[in-house]
Amino acid sequence: PMKVTSIKSKLDVRYYKINPENKDIQLLLHLLFSDQTMLTYIDPYKENRYKNFCHMMMNVEEVPFDSYPEYERSTLNTLVNLGCIRIDDDGMVRVVDQFDFTLYKLLYDYGVIPSYFMYANNTGKIDVLLDKGWVLPSDNLLTPKEQDYYSYYLDNERFDDGPAYRNRYAHANKVKTSDDEKGHKYAYYRMLLLLMILLLRIED
């Protein structure tokens, strides 16, 4: 039998997923969306408590480069080299393309960019990301994060601390009738939920 995590979509490309081997996209997403960087902690914006650098730039649109201390400017230059911000002649830091930030947000939140999203927007942006090696095409039905979710609940292939319901219930001799009834009920509802999600993904 085929594992749920291996089911293919009928589409040649269902998602564009983060290339786990590419360090540039990993660094870019960290600098844009991590709340652990200090890129938002500058006057006069630090009192606004922006979640991350992307959140700040989407709200203020431009910040003075010289408002950053010297040790943070190299980080900004890294983002310049990665092509997501620019430093103009007037000394202001600005976003190169706001739509790019939308794509980066999808990658950060979900790990993928749906192919239908790119078709609907009809841009060549995805080709740029592919050429840079930042994303890879995928024909899987489930995204990598969804695959992890299913693997956690169904087997011990990717995790060693999950319920592994498939492993447990596929072999009746491993299920004791004396087991907690609430536990069986919870497992039953959880597997129903997993089935519903899978059906929705197929319908989608």
What are these regions (language model features)?
Residues 148-204:
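Charge-enriched, short contiguous segments at helix-coil
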Residues 55-69:
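Short helix-coil junctions and helix-kink-helix linkers
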Residues 88-115, 167:
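Accessory beta->alpha helical hairpin/"wing" motif in late/C-terminal subdomains of nucleic-acid enzymes
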Residues 26-59:
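A short mid-domain helix/strand-loop element embedded in enzyme catalytic domains
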Residues 45-55, 74-75, 142, 157-165:
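Helix-boundary capping/turn motifs
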Residues 103-155:
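Flexible secondary-structure boundary motifs
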